[in-house]
């Protein structure tokens, strides 16, 4: 997401830990009336969600949007499948990626941009356990370097 755009509502931090993100896309969401109100209140969970290309359209599965408190009988199903709005070229690229072995579509963050709810969708490849361990070692080494650097600046 470029600078100065949108208010981030929810992030899928686990996705960056579990997957290598190859490419990202911005997609709009088709929502029902009370869903956008719940999103603006920050009542969204992207943890187990994923996207699939079905019949030339992209759908987001398992994204939990809590029912709106004042919504009474007009409330929505929290885990319903939601359509994503993308350009035809982008959908064709995503179809090409998902046909390849091991690629999946993962929502990385949900944000409001110009009054519309948007999802940052990542084309991802799963990490193996040893890849995750390498990342943890690299981060720990970086922390040690920064800590040593701060100690030297104090002297």
Curated annotation (Swiss-Prot):
Keywords: Cytoplasm, RNA-binding. GO terms for biological process: trans-translation. It is found in: Cytoplasm. GO terms for molecular function: RNA binding. Gene3D superfamilies: 2.40.280.10. It comes from the Bacteria. CDD domains: SmpB (cd09294). GO terms for cellular component: cytosol. The keyword Ubl conjugation does not apply. Required for rescue of stalled ribosomes mediated by trans-translation. Binds to transfer-messenger RNA (tmRNA), required for stable association of tmRNA with ribosomes. tmRNA and SmpB together mimic tRNA shape, replacing the anticodon stem-loop with SmpB. tmRNA is encoded by the ssrA gene; the 2 termini fold to resemble tRNA(Ala) and it encodes a 'tag peptide', a short internal open reading frame. During trans-translation Ala-aminoacylated tmRNA acts like a tRNA, entering the A-site of stalled ribosomes, displacing the stalled mRNA. Belongs to the SmpB family. This is SsrA-binding protein. It comes from Geobacillus thermodenitrificans (strain NG80-2).
